[in-house]
Regions:
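ABC transporter nucleotide-binding domains
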Residues: 1-143
């Protein structure tokens, strides 16, 4: 028997454009007519060459930039039409991990050290952080 229920996307990006005015005569089309869906439970990677618009797409998707045109829907609602309360709730649910090529990975640190660092910064003891990291690494098959 076929499942006829249509799955609704959690995130929909529709015809997203973000242009930057470089001068009165020149416009940089950082993102030009991008459309895609993300469904609950999916892991999505946006990959491409340096300068192709990956970070601009992410920044626009979480409202750090206003789009030139297009829409971003989260759970069926246009994020650019959120009221104050909806915006606060949205900020609790989404985040962007900014890329920094100069601090990406420290070759002197193990995966355990890197993952545990954030836990310790939030007040977790070294013993508890180590145990949590071991559990997480085992969960994803990196033990």
């Amino acid at each position: 028997m076929e499942n006829t229920e249509k799955k609704q996307p959690l995130v929909q990006v529709k015809n997203l454009c973000k242009y930057f005015e470089i001068s009165r005569k020149e416009t940089l089309k950082a993102v030009d007519d991008l459309t895609f869906d993300i469904y609950k439970g999916e892991t999505v990677s946006l990959v491409g060459e340096s300068g192709c618009g990956k970070s601009t797409t992410g920044r626009t998707m979480i409202k750090l930039y206003n789009p030139t045109s297009g829409n971003v829907y989260y759970d069926g609602k246009d994020i650019f039409k959120y009221n104050h309360a909806e915006q606060k709730e949205f900020c609790k649910k989404v985040q962007m991990i900014f890329q920094n090529p100069y601090s990406s990975l420290n070759p002197r640190m193990t995966v355990k050290d890197i993952v545990g660092e954030g836990l310790k910064q939030h007040g977790m003891s070294t013993k508890d952080a180590d145990a949590k990291v071991e559990q997480l690494l085992a969960t994803v098959g990196l033990n």
